Amino acid sequence: MTPSLANFLWSLLWGTAIVVIPVTVGLIFISQKDKIQRS
């Protein structure tokens, strides 16, 4: 695997992580908050 290809794959991985992790945390936070408001 060439270094440029490795860098490209790493940047894709980090890009995905940077987008997915906050979204997941946000959804969990919102669902927890909704549960508290409903009960």
From Swiss-Prot:
SUBUNIT field: PSII is composed of 1 copy each of membrane proteins PsbA, PsbB, PsbC, PsbD, PsbE, PsbF, PsbH, PsbI, PsbJ, PsbK, PsbL, PsbM, PsbT, PsbX, PsbY, PsbZ, Psb30/Ycf12, peripheral proteins PsbO, CyanoQ (PsbQ), PsbU, PsbV and a large number of cofactors. It forms dimeric complexes.
UniProt keyword Transmembrane, yes or no: yes
Membrane topology listed for this record: Single-pass membrane protein
Main location: membrane
Gene Ontology CC terms: photosystem II; plasma membrane-derived thylakoid membrane
First and last residue of the signal peptide: none
Keyword list, A-Z: Membrane, Photosynthesis, Photosystem II, Thylakoid, Transmembrane, Transmembrane helix
InterPro entries named in the record: PSII_PsbX, PSII_PsbX_type_1_subfam
Cellular localization per UniProt: Cellular thylakoid membrane
Top-rank lineage group of the source organism: Bacteria
The protein's name: Photosystem II reaction center protein X
TM region(s), chain numbering: 10-30
Any one of the GO BP annotations: photosynthesis
Family: Belongs to the PsbX family. Type 1 subfamily.
SS bonds (residue pairs): none
Function according to Swiss-Prot or TrEMBL: Involved in the binding and/or turnover of quinones at the Q(B) site of photosystem II (PSII). PSII is a light-driven water plastoquinone oxidoreductase, using light energy to abstract electrons from H(2)O, generating a proton gradient subsequently used for ATP formation.
